[in-house]
Amino acid sequence: MAKPTRGGQKKKVRRNVPSGVAHIQSTFNNTIVTIADTVGDVISWASAGSSGFKGAKKGTPFAAQQAAESAGRRAIDSGMRQCEVMVSGPGAGRETAIRALQAVGLEITLIRDVTPIPHNGCRPPKRRRV
């Protein structure tokens, strides 16, 4: 009889990565924190939704803080000590996510705002009438 195969699971490779890049994408509805090594391979990620927040609470600074702490702890477990931070988006959790990465123990060497700004590109959505 044939051996049962492992169902499509990759073996997790534990690498020792001393430095990397933390990308914080902060929108009005959610905050996503992705930590990668210098090559660009993702080491850990977390979002406000994956941290247990639902609905409008995902857009809060506290949810961004929890997501950044979760991703930062996993990055530290893989040996990361310092990182550069790339922040994009207009959301409420930008600064709190950076502070949470510092509080978790990552040394931040650079903070760069990489929010895409159009040179008069697409027409923006109409204004809300509430």
Swiss-Prot record:
Pfam families: Ribosomal_S11 (PF00411)
Designated gene of the protein: rpsK
NCBIfam families noted in UniProt: PRK05309.1, uS11_bact
Membership in a protein family: Belongs to the universal ribosomal protein uS11 family.
Keyword terms of this UniProt record: Ribonucleoprotein, Ribosomal protein, RNA-binding, rRNA-binding
Subunit structure: Part of the 30S ribosomal subunit. Interacts with proteins S7 and S18. Binds to IF-3.
GO cellular component: cytosolic small ribosomal subunit
Name recorded for this polypeptide: Small ribosomal subunit protein uS11
